[in-house]
Each structure stands twice: as C-alpha cells, then as structure tokens.
Amino acid sequence: MVKSWLRMSKKMEAGTLLMLLMSNILLWENVASVPRHASGAGRGEMSLHGLLDHAIILAHNVTELIAEMNSVFLEDVLYKPGRWFPERDLTACHRSPFTIAVSKEGTQQRLGVFLVKEMIGMLETWTFSLYHIANEMSHMEEPPDEIISRAKNIEEKIKELMDVLKGILNKIQPGSPQNERFPMWNELAYLRSPDEERRHFAFTNLFQCLLQDSRKFDSKVRLLKCRLIYNRDC
C-alpha cells in the first residue's frame, strides 16, 4: 500500500515537473517569436503628426550620418589613393528619387500616399546597398573598419525610419500595399567584379549617390508633413 502510494506520488511529481518544463518552453517560444523591431509596435498608438515629426528627426539624423560616413570615406581615399581610384568621373545613380509624375488634380493625401510608398521603396534600396557595401569591404585585404561600422549603423537607422514610414502609411491608407519597388543601383553588380579598379570605383560611386539621395530624402519627409498636416506644399 505504502509502496503504491510512493510510486503514485513520484508519477505525480514527474508529471508536475513535465508540465512546468513545457510551460517554460512555451514561454521562451513566445519571447523568441516577438519581432526584432517590436519596439515599433507602439507607434500604432502615435498620432499622424507625432509619426511625421519622428520621421523628420530620423531622416535628418540619417542624412547627417551618411555625410559623416562619406567624409570618412573621402579621408580614406585621400590617404590611400591607390585603393579607391577616385579620379574617374561618377556614373549615373540608380535613378533620381521622386521623379515619377503625379497628377496635380489628386488630393494632398493621395499625393502623400504615393510619396510615402516611394520613400519606403527607396529606403529598401539603401539598406540593400549598405549591406553589400559593408559585406564586400569586410573581405578587402585591409578592411576599412570604421566605414564598415558606420554603414551597419546607418542600415539599422534606416530600418527604424522605414518602420515609422510604414506606420504613417497605415494611418493614411490602412491596408495599402507597401512595396513600391525602386531599381537597384547599377554599380552594385561591380562590387564583386574581378577587375579591382572597377570594383573599388563602384564604392566611390555608391557613396556619392547615397549622399545625394539622402539630402533629397530629408527635404521630401518635410514636404510629406506639409501635405498631410497642412494640406499644401511648403
């Protein structure tokens, strides 16, 4: 009788431990399933005005970071000219941003929706390009570590800005598709070129294009606020 009770007690204890173990596993799975940018989930509670102000701050910050990275790059070019071959003229960038014609008869909100989608698509192009710049530079004989670190940091900032823009798009047109595709930069294909001079020049060209686009992007975020909040162009 006593032995039977002990066996039953041990089985109950084992069952309890198993349940606790399963509960912990499920808890960890739930934690692991939280999106990487879960902090952005709270932006759904922000007002449109608040999201736009946040986007303006982030865009300006990204523009400054890109300008700083470009300065570091040009300094590296100055002291290591044989690495980058900067004497060649720049080729055309992937496309001047925000040049697609939009009907003037559309409402400011419709124009705003179009502009947000364009900006999201453009940022996707930037993140793709920055990733490949950092990746290819890391395989150089003497990797420019500071430039690589800055490129990765800017990539993360851009992802945060994209998150805010998607929040804005959801405010002004809920359920709208977000994938307005931008063509990739032509120079990306040359980052893996067997021609060392061509490959290194591609970096120079990409940095210049990124700098030009970031300055235009900064002003367009401010224009977006004018269209959506004040119903006019500033």
UniProtKB/Swiss-Prot annotation:
Q: Which cysteines are joined by disulfide bonds?
A: 93-209, 226-234
Q: Which Gene Ontology MF annotations are present?
A: hormone activity; prolactin receptor binding
Q: What residues bear carbohydrate chains?
A: 61
Recorded hits in Pfam families, A to Z, give: Hormone_1
What compartments host this protein? Answer: Secreted
Q: Which UniProt keywords are present, listed alphabetically? A: Disulfide bond, Glycoprotein, Hormone, Secreted, Signal
Q: Which GO terms describe its cellular component?
A: extracellular space
Entries under CDD domains matching the protein: prolactin_like (cd10288)
Q: Which GO terms describe its biological process?
A: cell surface receptor signaling pathway; female pregnancy; mammary gland development; positive regulation of lactation; positive regulation of receptor signaling pathway via JAK-STAT; response to nutrient levels
Task: Give the signal peptide, or none.
Answer: 1-33
What family classification does the UniProt entry report for this protein? Belongs to the somatotropin/prolactin family.
The protein's matches in PANTHER family, at most eight in alphabetical order, are given as: PROLACTIN-6A1, SOMATOTROPIN,PROLACTIN
Q: What is this protein called?
A: Prolactin-6A1
